[in-house]
Amino acid sequence: MATRFIAKHGLKSNINRLTLSEGEIAIAYSDDKSEAEIYVGGNDNTPIPAAGASMKTKNQIFVVCDGDHDELKIQAALSRATRGTVVYIMGDCVLTNENTQDSGLVSGFGHYNAILNVGIRVALDGTYCSSITFKNTNPAARQVIFFLGIMAKLKNINFQEDNTTCTQTSVNPMILFGNSNAIVDNCVLGEVYDVNQDDSTVGNIIMCSGSKFTNNVIDGWCLKTKTNIGACMKFTKVFVDNNKFTNIWTTDNSESGHLMAISSSIFTHNVFEDSVVPKGNIYFSGNNSLCNHNIFNSSDIGNITLAGNTANNVFISLDLNECIAVKLRSICNDNTFFGLKVKEGDCAFDLGVEATFANNYIKNLSIITTDSTEVKGYNILYANKAFCRDNVILLSATTNKLENLYVIEANASSVVTGNVTSASSIGQLDEGCVAEGNTVAWS
């Protein structure tokens, strides 16, 4: 029988006086309410300890939700939670934005109203919660659903927005703000709509700074890409590990903007796939950024900017509005690029000053041209005082036949050595460019 969560609770010393039907659940507290234990109904309506769900450690609060403005119940629990407390949400939870609190957000980001304000070193845990649904019954700017204080945790949450009150055009709240050393782990954030707020500090659905974002699923987001008003997902000095970003889409391609902005962060073992945001950019910045062992797959996006150290990633079946850019003094090594299409640009990879592009495998790359009569030059790699060595560059049959195709265009300060290409020429190398050991017409 499926468990239905009900608001039965009391002292453990009185638990045997409670009638608890099979499929029901209750919480029993110690006399001083510093400890709690979960009981379920037995087949004779007597309470029995829940196997594997006994909670006897101190500093735990259980909130039983009933679907009616559950933010009030959770706010009450969070307000009395001391450092080290875990607040457990139970049942099917429904949040509204009719009851918000001042988040006390630090200067520089302005004022936010939080629906759930998780304090310093407090954890909000959805282990016993079937789902959390947000209803946008009081639309207003500068709202955030989960505000995490320093060293706060958000864990095991299954969240989605109600698609009758949150729409593609309504003013919607930011989902998450994570402060320094906050942790977001094992959460599902699904069916989310853009905030639709034209401000650089509130144009984000997720904003994390100095925190950890691990083992989460982002699924089914409807976005509106924007110019200079933030990023849909913004990570600054964040450890972003083992997450899945999937089925992100848009109905508004009028402007280009950052789908994901990752600054001075570690971005590793993530999967980004099956998304269609044709003018949404993935943007890395900061020379200490690290992007490795990720998969970017089967998506139609704007462009990708790489910074810091990018290694051992797989980029496969991507339709790009423009190129992949490698920022100055950045390293892009040992990656696989398979089946990339550049739809509007005339360059596939743009290497910044003193960038290194080495040991990469590029196969079946296409530059899409709309006018076959147009006299225009095309570059696979453009190197501006860059180091380009030991790459395999295999083009699609159509791209291989383009007029004025330069596999590598490099200026006099660049180094181009040991590359292999299917094209008949290595490209256009300025006098003074160091060029050695390159192989052409390879098949």
Predicted ranges, named:
Residues 138-140, 150-271, 276-282, 287:
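Right-handed parallel beta-helix
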Residues 17-39, 77, 87:
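Short hydrophobic/aromatic-rich beta-strand motifs
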Residues 404-443:
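Leucine-rich solenoid repeat scaffolds
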Residues 59-90, 94-100:
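Acidic Gly/Asp/Thr-rich repetitive segments characteristic of extracellular carbohydrate-active
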Residues 65-72, 94-97, 107-114, 121-173, ...:
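Right-handed parallel beta-helix/beta-spiral solenoid domain characteristic of secreted/periplasmic
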Residues 84-92, 126-132, 152, 157, ...:
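Extracellular beta-strand-rich, repetitive "passenger/adhesive" scaffolds
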Residues 1-25, 33, 45-52:
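Extracellular/surface-exposed low-complexity repeats and stalk/linker segments enriched in Gly/Pro
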